[in-house]
Amino acid sequence: MIFQSFILDNLVFLCMKIINSIVVVGLYYGFLTTFSIGPSYLFLLRARLVEEGTEKKISATTGFITGQLIMFISIYYAPLHLALGRPHIITVIALPYLLFQFFGNNHKNFLNYGYKNPNSIRNFSIQRIFFHNLIFQLLNPFFLPSSILIRLVNIYLFRCNNKFIFLISSFIGWIIGHTFFMKWIEFILVRIQQTNSIKSNVRIQSNKYIMSEFRNSMLKIFLVFLFITCLYYLGRVPPPFFSKKLSEIQETHEIYKKGKKIDVEKNLQRVQTKQKQKRSNNKEGFLSLFSKNENNLYKIDEEKYKLGFVKKPLVNILFNYKRWNRPFRYIKNNRFENVVKNEISEFFFHTCQSDGKERISFMYPPNLSTFHKMMETKFYLFTKDKISYDELSNYWSYTNEEKRNKLSNEFVNRAKVMDKELISLDILENRIRLSNDETKTKYLTKIYDPFLNGRFRGQIENVFSTSIQYEKNEKKNTILINKIHGILISNNTYKKNNSNYPELEKKINIFDRKSLVTTFFFFNLISKFSKKLVSSLSFETLSLFPEHEQVKINYEEEKKQIIKILFDAIRTDLNEKTIVNGNRTKCIRINEIRKKVPRWSYKFIDELEQLEGKNEAENYQIRSRKAKRVVILTNKSKFFKKYDTYNPTGDTDNAEKKKNELALIRYSQQSDFRRDIIKGSIRAQRRKTVTWKFFQKRVHSPLFLDKIEKPLFFSFDSFKSMKIFFMFKIWMRKKEEFEISSYTEERAKESSKKEEEKKKENEERKRIEIAEAWDSIIFAQVIRGILLITQSILRKYILLPSLIITKNIARILFFQFPEWSEDFRDWKREMYIKCTYNGVQLSEREFPKKWLTDGIQIKILFPFRLKPWHKSKLRSNEKKKDLMKKKNFCFLTVWGMEVDLPFSGSPQKNRFSSFFDPIFKELKKKTKQFQFFTFRVLKVLSEKLKLFLTILIEKAKRISKSIIESILKSILKSILSLTKIKQFFKLLFIKFKFKKIDELSENKKDSTIYKNNPMISETTISIQSINSVNCSLKKKKIKDLNAKRKAVIKKIEKIKKGLVISETNIHSNKTTYDSKRVEFEKKKLQILQRRRNARLTRKSHSFFKFFMKRIYRDIFLYISCIPRINIQLFLELTKKFLNKSIYDNEANAERIYKTNQSIIRFISILHKYFHTRNPNSHNSCDISFLSQAYVFFNLLHTRIININIYKLRSVFQYHGIFFFLKNEIKDSFFGAQGIFHYKLKHNNPLNSVRNQWTNWLKDHYYQYDLSKSRWSRLVPQKWRNRITEYRIAQNKDLTKCNSYEKSQLILYKEQQVNALKKKIRKQYRYDLLSYNFINYADKKDSYIYGYRSLFQVKKNQVISSNYNTYKKELFDIIDNLFIKNYISEDAILDMEKNLYRKYFDWMGINREILNRSISNPEFWFFSKFVIFYDAYRGNSQVIPIKLLFFSSNVNQNVSENKKNITRKKKNESLELELETRNRAKAEYPDQRNLESSISNQEKDIENDYVGSDSEKNSKGIKKKKDKNKMEAELNFLLRNFLILHLNWNNFLGQRIFNNVKVYCLLIRLKNLREITIASIQRGELGLDIMMIQNQKNLILLGLRKKKNNKFMKKEIFVIEPVRLSRKNNKQFFMYQTIGLSLIQKNKRKIYHKYPEKIHVNKKNFYKYITRTRDQKITEKKEKDNSDLLVPENILSARRRRELRILICLNPNNINSMHRNTIFYNPNKVQNGFPLLTKKRKYFEKDKKKLMNFKIFLWPKYRLEDLACINRYWFNTHNGSRFSIVRIHMYPRMKIR
């Protein structure tokens, strides 16, 4: 089983090795590249399908494979890659190839003459197929872009070490894949032919030769398809031969100027003769290397400059290979725009020596690599031995050991001298500084001194203005040294022109490697000095490294000669840039040392810069958003001379002649698709973007078209109009019946207004679209401008005169007087003013600039209106009315029409209406008069006809009555024999008949039948007469009949009365049936309404319950979170805060005390509430971040020791440096638990160690004890709720209230001194911190200069966890924590003189507010009060409480009397006044002056606060005062928190724009009176806005109306919040994260460490008692614990760090393993720690000696020192690896 598992493991390992090998990976990637099929496969497939013969198919495949092989080789071979990748080379190959292809396919016997055998290799058709496949494979990257699969090869090639094997294997993989692909295609084709899967269902009968023609035309079809693919790719990348040429930057040659040419040849001859005399025969070959030839060194190509241009190669002239083809942006910095490219990338790869080994660095300095390349090319003659890696590593370790020994010996010697008490200043090592003089009295400035460390390195503080002028001290001996100028001679010129070149080849072996290294060191030394006196250079003392002192004497002469050539032979003068020889007076010109740097070939400007006139380039190259330059004013006045003139041509002479212009830029409203792309480059091909409108603001994706409101092809306007018509009809019907309510009327008015606004918006939009359309069309503005001018000429001189002539001729024909003079007077009044494209008028004869390209408008002033007749002169009132109504201007269109606005779609109708309207009016009048006359005539006629007809009717009635009576008499006589009943009915019928006639003829109302019917009476009379004749016969019967007749008549009268009443009611005012129906409906609605109200009243109880639940859930649940607040107390507080004023100083103090007590009492309630809610969250810091310290501290509190800890005994007994475990934690914890050896165990018991741990945690991890405002920005809320924090009680006397800042200009020198002191103290603190870490174990030996162990328990130390512990905020932290005068005077540490401790730091409140974030719930409510709670509690006697809450502008009382300017000055902002006073007081920090000034300040505050009230005591002024207070608070919040960007385009308003247009016209005219009066009368010129006094009137004209929503919709008024960078205190967080190395002491540490603070002068509390070191020693302190000085300060800061790191390094162990390994075997490193295995006795024996070196150990995990370990000290490069973090360090050492 073991053997099988062994075999399986080996097989798996072998398989993994094979899979990960380069060959297999290359085969895999090569196989993948076959799937990247391009257009090169077209020729191959064509040869397989169409060509006949195996030779042609073989030639196609071989050509294809060779082309692919060349492409693979080009990946590895750089020159071939450049040759195939450059566009002009591809163009040279592609153009002849396409021509050859075209002629070869059109001519069958093209270049095949004389060859009869078609299958021979000499046949050109076979060769042509081969070259087709070969060349097109090379042109594949040109026609189609390389696919991802091909690019994978390039990517992996960079990672691979053995590149050539990878390329071969990938090529083989590609061949395998290609063969599989071709076989698969052949298989498919054969399968198709065998199975006949493609069958033609349609038979071709008309033409049998179509298929043969199709086969013959396959070549042409193929060419067309190839041409389409080429065009497709050319659309993506434009070819270089069709690209647009851009103007390049012209190089300025300053050497050759007019009048400054020097006779170069004469100077050359003199210098050459003198140099030849000094040359020695022995060193002739060597010196000739550094001398330049007569012909080529000093000779300048004058012909190049005589021609005026630099000679360029033909390729650069034909092909612009540097241009932008891709849609790249031209990014530039407007402030610092340079010609040189900033192409230094973030990574630069180069081989370097790191840790004694050669490694690839990706952060290598590019300048250094270029210098190495230059030196390698120039020193190719010297033989250079290759150095092995072992030699390099040994050399590196050897140099480090030597440095360490040298530094340690030097330090020990200095320390020994100090032990002998021979203290002198020479013992202390001074800083190395660069000097300019031998006496070392003058040094370089701190900014330019590289040996100085600190804040001066790399920083230049601009304290004063840059206008300080320094005098130039010209010295005779100061020169600029031309560095290594003789070395950098070009090799080609040297070989060609040097006659001594063959002699030099014999002397190549003179120089060996060491001599070359020494020369290089001298070159590096020389390069450090850019300006130096020649006499001060002494190279004998310059030996920076010890190994370079042992140089052979044989090469000293060579070095001297090299230096002599470098310094004495050729030097560059400062002023004239000439070459000066040391002892000569002649001057020679040479070319300086030059390096070809990446330069911008072009300096582009955008279209906006050209329009603004900033640059003087001829044409722009960057296409910006479409815009036009709108010229508002051109004038030669002095006011406009300060503006830059618009000079697109760049001619200064023409620019001076041109008028000064005041112009604006108008942007197009089209969508910007240019996107700052350079001319000639392609656009970015963006997918998923569609534009379906001609004018579209934004590009939309088709995926979201359903979410966008799209205009359809048809609209529903017709349906809307029909709907409106029907609504109007219904409304009219209802109007007849009942009235419309007022609500509906208002709605109708609003809808009509909206419709009008929509119409205006649509018209404006259409107008803009037309204007943009004219801009978008090519040459449209030229055509339009010419048409407008022709239309104006035709109108003025042809059309209008012809109309005048025809009108007057017509008047003559109608026998009226002609009006020639009146018409021509109006014709002459018409003016044609040329305007810009935007409508700004210039003058009648002045054309705008570039009007053919930019466009033109023609405005017609006082347009001619043809009138049929002219009236007499109107009155003045009528004239004013007409002028106000009419607009006496219009714009001319292309069609000759008149328009109110440019590009308006609706033309005016005034041209013909002015002529025909008066005629139509007169016709209307005449028709009205005629109608009135005819109406009167007809009325009279109608009345007369009515009378005539009535008379005729009456006569006819009378005649008819007589005739009827005679007829009746005859009838009665003839019918006497009939019965009585027949006679009765006949008489009754006649009576009814006549009754109806009488009733129709008479129209009287409310009359009886008898009164209205005289015929009845007559008939009765006639009947009575008849009865009287026959009375004797039938008297009784007639009486009976009369009675019956009367009864019937009465019944008829009753029926008639009902009918008459109904008829009269129709014409009366009483209600009809319809009105009754409407009333019934109203009653019905009222009944329903009553039912609904009753239903609501029934359900009101449940509804009220539901409403109360909602209120409780939404409102009162949130209010319940608010703590219990004393409302009465809060109201009293607000009353006192707002209404009380300051009268005297005593009353002020009483008021302040009361209000402070109330505020503190009020806010203490909030504090208690919130602290009692979460008793566990005493503070807002999270100690769980402590990782190691926190975990071990908790383990220490658990008295039960886990068994697993003993398993780590071997790990923790190792006294080396751990990667993830700090030694202090390990020793303190595990030493206490007894894991170490019993002799090495700590003597303290468990409780004392626990106290030490608590102290250690507080001292070392105080950075987690942040303030609430800062912790809230770092830690979330839930972490803060889980915190228990041990706090230390602080003394309130130690507060820092330094609230007075000092001015930089006055105290500049003091700041410099303070900065130096701070720097020294900071450095001293860091050193002491490192000693505290090293000496943590022993109390007695760890006390170094007054510092005790951080683990030492103190009696006065009090640990408390009370949540009411007063915690200091940001402005209470002590800034300058330092040791003051530590040698001569020892004061209480970290304590400063605080003269202003009684006064509150109110100047820093604004900064505090900005950095505070409301994170705790107590800040949700009354945040203004809680902000200053902790700060104001101990300082409540100086400044009024109002000044705390409003640090800005409390009394901005603006007086109504504007004339009283002095009162305004007195009532300025309080903040500025106090700032100036504080600055004055900072200059004189005297106690008496300070107290008096502060009392005066309080009085001034009172006077300012009460100043406005003392004069006017009315109630209105008090209200204004309260409003001003609230405005001050609002302005304070807005100024500090609200920062907005207003993109307000139309901020001036339409009236001001109209005024501007009129001003532009009036400025150009001489006689202004008539036009100004006319414009004022028309209302175009507003006198009220000609002088704008207040800025608010100018800005907020458009905002006065409530139309903000409208502006937001139109995108005119846009509020965009500015993305403000958060103002974080970077240094604070950096120091907090670094933690251990950069401790910034808090005040509570002062209480721990310095119990001497009790000794304070109580009378003068602002002073503290300073005591010297002797006084402290006499005060019962052990003399052994006080060290006079830290011995490490003997060395300088730089040497100190170097010594620490060299001691920590162990080159022997480091060389045994690689630096990048994280895990290693600790058993191999046991030899490096022999002391740890010895006994404690021996350890205690060497304890005193160890103490001397313990302080020099490099502090653990010092990130500052880690950053300093770089190649400058140990040839270690930090760019590639930061492996120095894993340096092994000695915890303890023994002096050997």
Curated annotation (Swiss-Prot):
Pfam families: Ycf1. It comes from the Eukaryota. One of its GO terms (cellular component) is chloroplast inner membrane. Its main location: plastid. It is found in: Plastid, Chloroplast inner membrane. InterPro entries: TIC214. The chain crosses the membrane at residues 18-38, 64-84, 87-107, 129-149, 165-185, 221-241. GO terms for biological process: protein transport. Keywords: Chloroplast, Membrane, Plastid, Plastid inner membrane, Protein transport, Transmembrane, Transmembrane helix, Transport. It is a multi-pass membrane protein. Belongs to the TIC214 family. Involved in protein precursor import into chloroplasts. May be part of an intermediate translocation complex acting as a protein-conducting channel at the inner envelope. There is a partial copy of the N-terminus (positions 1-162) of ycf1 in the inverted repeat (ABC25181). Part of the Tic complex. This is Protein TIC 214. It comes from Glycine max (Soybean). The lineage of its organism: Eukaryota, Viridiplantae, Streptophyta, Embryophyta, Tracheophyta.
